[in-house]
Amino acid sequence: MSLNKKLALIIIDGLGIGKKDDTNAVYLANPKTLNYLIKNYPTLEISAAQQPIGLLENQAGNSEIGHLTIGAGRIILNDNANINSYTKRLDYESLVLNDINNEIVHVVGMYSNGLVHSNYEHIHWIIKELVKNNNQVVLHLISDGRDDYPYGFAQFIEQINALKTQYNVIIKSLSGRYFAMDRDQRWERTQKAFNTMFIKQDKICEQSLLEVAQSIANHYESDEFVEPIVFNNDEKYNLKPYQKVILTNYRSDRMRQLAHLLKPNRKFNYHNPFLIKDIHLITLVPFPDVDAITLFEKQNLNNTLGDVLNDHHIKQARVAETEKYGHISFFFDGGINKHYASKTQYLIPSQKVATYDLCPQMSASLITKTIIDHYFDHDVFIVNYANPDMVGHSGNMKQTIQAILSVDSEIQKLYDFFKKNNGVLMITGDHGNAETMIDANGQIITSHSINDVWFIITDNNIVFDQTQKFSLANIAPTILEYLNIKKPIEMAASSMIKKIHK
């Protein structure tokens, strides 16, 4: 099937709708192209957080659930909610954990209530289950500072110390997520975290966990950047062959590199010089390309937007830079690596900088160039521009403004090119971030927001339904109606289109 009009779904990561004041980098940037499109084309404000996309009240959206929901065309049970449906049951017992007896078990996870990559309550649950069978838990903590308050880790120390006392947990190490959860193949970061966690170190931290947490603000920009440190250097708590390691983060994209260092997989070519063989790796949910035992199964999503386009032989292109590549492929396709005959994926390398506020333009221009260069090769483009989110996470207002302006400039190029060639853009965000940079107390915010996002279509023949509130789940049905394709029954959400003028 060949389309009369080329269509591009442009997902501007972290671009939400906020207050028109100096806490909002989007407002301060005053992006002329986006402003023009919002004013001159059909536009809706749609939900990208909380219950409308299957999250909890006051829970911010994130890139994983955002792309998952956009691609699925329905509200889905996210990993956190799915896991909670088991762990909150008093009668639930894990067969995997019940089979672990009288062992030293390493537990690794981000202790955070950001609920983007992890939930600290899952760490509690796993520890409680393990100690029932006389296991010794060795805990490796990862601090957040990105999906939570910049220095929010200190608030958890009392809880963590209670775990230590009540369950005789060994607090072995602490690492900022910058190191332990890199996803851009900066292997020196992941290796540093691995070595600190599992390999004997010459230097041990003399401070208590509380003292370290209280001093983070004096040494680091946020909890995210805490250098990996060891609290216990006892040889018997270093990782050894045949021992078990449980990764408690449920989101895979920022755990796969650490998983690779524990148990090499075909995804990466990097070799761990300190590889410990025959490790038994356990994850909460299945991770792509990772050989691990899983505690919980993922929800199986069929008939996603990618499936339907492929079934109709519509040539689709996925374009993003490294930081968000997994989102427009793995997550967009329902949390599965699907290889469609009709799909071409373009991976644009992210800039090799320590943090993206040092390069707010990121690789946006190469994304645009790739789309334009391959315009006539495909029918539908699924695109992610990462700048507002990745730079917004730095908390640097000035550079976040530059990030937004960089993307705005690229949108102008795409708009001009698509208009000239009778193509159409659909523009949205996957969640908010850059529009809420400072809180009511004047503190920097580096985390996502619960704000709405725009949905714009550059076709004035479209009339949107203004009588109800829509969400990210309505995007796929809208695309299918625009393409005159019947949506599958699994897509429970409706189209946002009221009428198409011929």
Curated annotation (Swiss-Prot):
Active-site positions, per UniProt?
Answer: 63
Query: Which cofactor(s) does the record list?
Result: Mn(2+)
How far does the signal peptide extend, from start to end residue?
none
The processes (GO biological process) annotated in the record are:
glucose catabolic process; glycolytic process
Recorded GO cellular component terms are: cytosol
Pfam families named among the record's database cross-references: iPGM_N, Metalloenzyme
Which pathway does the UniProt entry assign to this protein? Carbohydrate degradation; glycolysis; pyruvate from D-glyceraldehyde 3-phosphate: step 3/5
Q: What is this protein called?
A: 2,3-bisphosphoglycerate-independent phosphoglycerate mutase
